A protein has these predicted regions:
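N-terminal membrane-targeting hydrophobic helices
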Residues: 2-259
Length: 259
């Protein structure tokens, strides 16, 4: 089983949209409470696709494997947790619309370093669980993966050239996105002192994203490589988000609450 999952995810790179993957693990926080880390679960569920983003092309040799999760996804996932909480979180929330800010008070005030020092085992296990949930989901939506073969999902829908797994791939992306949006909207709103959004924050992110993607194309990425264009665009956006947020933190002096 492990070999099938790992091998075929490398050969067939098309996948459900990365940011729909947390949908499958959100219920675990309600079930297990303090015994799991929501940050760890969410970032863990995204981490396997970060090999694509790091390479800026759809190639995964390690992150979609059972063993690779332990030596690749786990340390990368923990690093991403720190990048999000210590660099991205505060400026991102403060420059988001009010309906987002009002639901993010608890997240914004979380002292991640303190939480991690006390709960590093919980965070680590949550990252691993999240990563395995990603691989499990993908095993239903990739050609010739274990569950695709087991349930014969490679069969084409009658009268079309579309295999069943491809329908599951796109359908699960939409359903996952809806679940995540609904989960967010159900979060309690709190009365807060809203931060005034700085449009320059978003303009800088857009400009830097386009600049990075342009360099990537100049270095040999063909416009017709649609999948690679998409992952390169996402990677460029995340790099831009990180550096612009870091600049905002340095410019304003940061806030000790979020250290």
């Amino acid at each position: 089983m492990h070999k099938h999952v790992a091998t075929n995810l490398k050969k067939k790179p098309k996948m459900p949209f990365t940011f729909s993957h947390p949908a499958i693990i959100l219920p675990l926080k309600n079930i297990f409470g303090k015994w799991v880390s929501l940050t760890g679960l969410i970032i863990g569920s995204l981490t396997p696709d970060f090999e694509y983003f790091l390479r800026m092309k759809i190639q995964s040799d390690y992150s979609h494997t059972i063993i690779g999760t332990l030596w690749f996804n786990l340390p990368l996932g923990i690093l991403l947790c720190f990048i999000f909480h210590d660099i991205i979180k505060k400026p991102l929330i403060e420059n988001s619309p009010n309906f987002i800010q009002s639901r993010m008070k608890e997240l914004k005030s979380l002292n991640w370093k303190e939480y991690f020092m006390k709960n590093w085992i919980t965070v680590s296990l949550s990252v691993v669980i999240g990563a395995y949930s990603h691989i499990f989901w993908d095993s239903f939506t990739h050609s010739h993966s274990f569950f695709t073969n087991f349930f014969e999902l490679n069969r084409k829908i009658e009268g079309t050239d579309i295999p069943i797994f491809k329908i599951l791939q796109h359908l699960s992306t939409v359903i996952g996105g809806i679940i995540i949006i609904r989960y967010f909207l159900k979060q309690k709103t709190e009365i807060i002192d809203y931060s005034e959004q700085n449009i320059k924050y978003w303009i800088n992110i857009i400009i830097l994203t386009i600049s990075i993607l342009t360099v990537r194309i100049y270095l040999g990425l063909r416009i017709t490589e649609y999948g690679n264009i998409i992952v390169s665009g996402i990677a460029s956006g995340m790099i831009a988000l990180t550096f612009v947020s870091l600049y905002e933190q340095r410019k304003t002096g940061g806030n000790t609450v979020y250290n």
